[in-house]
Amino acid sequence: MFDDDSEVERKGKPRHLLGIADEESIRHAVTRGIDTLDSCYPTRVARHGTVLTKDGPLKMRSGKYSKAFGVKIDESCTCPTCQQYDRAYLWHLFKAHEPLAVTLAAQHNIHYMNEMMRGIREDIMENKI
């Protein structure tokens, strides 16, 4: 999908990829010359009870988080969700079908993706990509 540029003549124009999803796909696309992208991935997975972390996605509806009091969603995250709430509370919100669960998970996921993209931009500026 990203490897064949033979039919695409760039002429200095940016290349946009619509609907790219997960972190691995984004990194792959960037290394193949994609300049811009958009995605509903962070909010879509939040609606299904998943939060994104540096250690991989967490399915917050899992009972293993029911007693995770005092444990941040992602220990290194600086988003408002991680600063104010723990995994047990987010688990409770999802189990109780509270709309706030999706709001908090989406807020976290968007922050996570923004930080990931910041890192990719820094890698590009430092010629690591």
Where are these regions (language model features)?
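Glycine-rich phosphate/ribose-binding loops and adjacent secondary-structure elements
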Residues: 1-73
